[in-house]
């Protein structure tokens, strides 16, 4: 394991140990980070632009309150389906090291979007592929390909309701009913269908958790709040520049990836053109036959034209046969560098970025914690973050008195901000902060 990866895991453990992140619910999502440089790296799918692009992925795990505490930085050759089990395993290991009980570890609830919809992934999380059949986690996910059957359900079946209490937006009441569906390559799966809004839009939710383990109301609450993670990623993107990388270093790949043989693609295109020509000629024969029956064309002329067309079809069929033989001789996949005149794909070294992202996520979490303290003295919830920024970015004087370092903020004209700033300083002073150098001088904050 590289140093950056180890640092990320150790910080994740400390988030759990110090109560900054809460164990129990883990939302997992990925963010595509595009790369516009000159190096040849693998491509991924840009969800916003809907095109393949060179880039990498940041996979983030957050708790029920959307506190980011575990994340991975990976090349775009690794997707969310592969990373969900890895993040779960890392999270459980760090949970054990942080002192979480084994019962709580095994009852971890994992929530992800439709991108994680996969029978193979569901079976892996259920433990179907493990020798000991041990479940990895309780998963909750939106179902795919359910648009048709959910709208065929009778309105009367939606006889239960749950109120979703969001962090900022107004609460919403949803109707739902519980059933069971058969999923290809997985089998029977617990399903909850919800109906929302005036338009009565319907969506299906899949989970492997039993009724005893997790109630339907909680399942609906958890997955409907999943947008909180999307908002978190946007905040990390725009306020903390999570897409930034402090330089790019590359590493050679152990093996060049195998790609579809372009010669086969070229031959298949050529074969398709020939088959289209054959079909057009067959249509021409049918048209001639109709024209002859209607008396528009003599039988002799039709037969002469038909003989000529059939000869052309025979030639084209022979060409198609030769192309098929050529395709069979060629390998289906070839190495990337063999196709691109020796140019090789490389992978980016993410060590600097991992270290920097650890700092950024730590700063984000500390800002959230300070907002919690500030909210005791500043009651405008929607303005709490701007108020905090006004305080922490305020000009200050530093004064050393004896062995105490005083940080003195200039007072604020706004009385509400001034009041909140003074009490925030008191909260910080109660934590007994000190300088991180060898002197360990006590720090005292005040507003004057």
Residue spans for each PLM region:
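A short, flexible helix-boundary coil/loop motif
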Residues: 167-172, 262-448
């Amino acid at each position: 394991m590289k140093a950056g990866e180890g640092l990320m895991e150790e910080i994740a453990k400390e988030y759990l140990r110090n109560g900054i992140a809460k164990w129990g619910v883990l939302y997992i999502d990925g963010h595509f980070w595009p790369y516009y440089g000159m190096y040849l790296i693998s491509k991924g799918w840009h969800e916003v632009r809907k095109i393949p692009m060179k880039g990498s992925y940041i996979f983030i795990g957050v708790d029920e309150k959307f506190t980011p505490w575990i994340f991975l930085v990976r090349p775009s050759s690794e997707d969310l389906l592969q990373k969900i089990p890895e993040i779960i395993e890392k999270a459980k290991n760090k949970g054990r090291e942080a002192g979480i009980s084994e019962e709580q570890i095994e009852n971890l609830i994992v929530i992800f979007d439709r991108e994680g919809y996969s029978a193979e992934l569901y079976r892996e999380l259920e433990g179907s592929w493990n020798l000991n059949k041990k479940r990895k986690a309780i998963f909750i996910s939106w179902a795919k390909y359910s648009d048709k059957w959910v709208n065929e359900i009778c309105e009367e079946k939606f006889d239960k309701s749950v109120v979703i209490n969001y962090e900022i937006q107004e609460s919403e009441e949803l109707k739902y009913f519980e059933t069971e569906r058969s999923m290809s390559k997985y089998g029977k799966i617990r399903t909850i269908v919800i109906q929302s809004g005036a338009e009565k839009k319907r969506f299906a939710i899949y989970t492997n958790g039993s009724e005893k383990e997790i109630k339907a109301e909680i399942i609906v609450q958890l997955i409907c709040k999943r947008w909180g993670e999307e908002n978190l990623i946007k905040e990390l993107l725009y306020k903390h520049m999570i897409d930034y990388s402090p330089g790019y270093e590359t590493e050679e790949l152990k093996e060049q990836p195998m790609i579809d043989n372009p010669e086969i693609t070229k031959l298949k295109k050529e074969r398709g053109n020939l088959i289209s020509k054959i079909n057009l000629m067959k249509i021409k024969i049918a048209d001639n036959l109709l024209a002859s029956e209607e008396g528009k064309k003599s039988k002799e002329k039709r037969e002469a034209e038909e003989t000529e067309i059939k000869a052309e079809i025979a030639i084209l069929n022979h060409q198609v046969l030769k192309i098929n033989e050529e395709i069979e001789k060629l390998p289906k996949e070839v190495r990337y560098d063999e196709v691109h005149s020796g140019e090789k794909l490389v992978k980016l070294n993410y060590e600097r970025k991992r270290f920097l992202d650890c700092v950024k996520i730590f700063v984000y979490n500390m800002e959230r914690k300070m907002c919690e303290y500030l909210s005791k003295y500043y009651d405008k919830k929607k303005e709490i973050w701007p108020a905090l920024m006004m305080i922490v970015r305020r000009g200050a004087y530093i004064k050393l008195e004896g062995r105490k370092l005083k940080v003195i903020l200039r007072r604020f004209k706004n009385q509400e901000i001034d009041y909140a700033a003074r009490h925030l300083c008191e909260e910080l002073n109660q934590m007994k902060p000190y300088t991180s150098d060898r002197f360990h001088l006590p720090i005292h904050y005040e507003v004057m």
